[in-house]
Amino acid sequence: EERKSKNEEKIIINNLREEFLQIQNDLQLKIDQLNNSKNVVQQLMNLLGKNKTQIKNTNTDSLIYYSLTWPEFNPTSSVLNDLLQSGRLRLITNTDLRKLLFKWTPAIEEVKSQYDEMIRFNNDRVFEYLNKYVSFKNVDNYGMVFWREKSVFKIDHSFLFNQLYYENMLEGQLYFFTESSTS
């Protein structure tokens, strides 16, 4: 019976290892995407207060698009969930590992909560504000929607980059990026 338990523990640990390696790879990709978005927001911050020519010579539609692209981290934890639900977590004899596994779900919930807060900020504040000053038809050309022509409306982003309110929006985004990268 003990040998059977040891073999089952080895299988469980191997499955957990594979799952966590995949999560680690996914997490690194999300961190890279998050850092890219953070860098774009910093580029937008650097345009604040610049003259009309400097702003016009920058592809602000592209920067705005990428500043709004925030990666979601939603790892699968099927092996761990199965262990928790079946009670087989008791088969893991390493107490430190068991403690870490118990902390995993709350840690993921915290990350999801931060992501939801970032999305609410973007949707409720940033998008609402940008709707008044940018053409999302132009901005979306850098995402999954490719328009053949730009907006029929003349868009001048220099007004946007001379607004304290927009600076505060960008600073808010940087706050969330920084908070996310320290969790």
Where are these regions (language model features)?
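Long, hydrophobic alpha-helical segments that serve as membrane-spanning/inserting helices
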Residues: 2-183
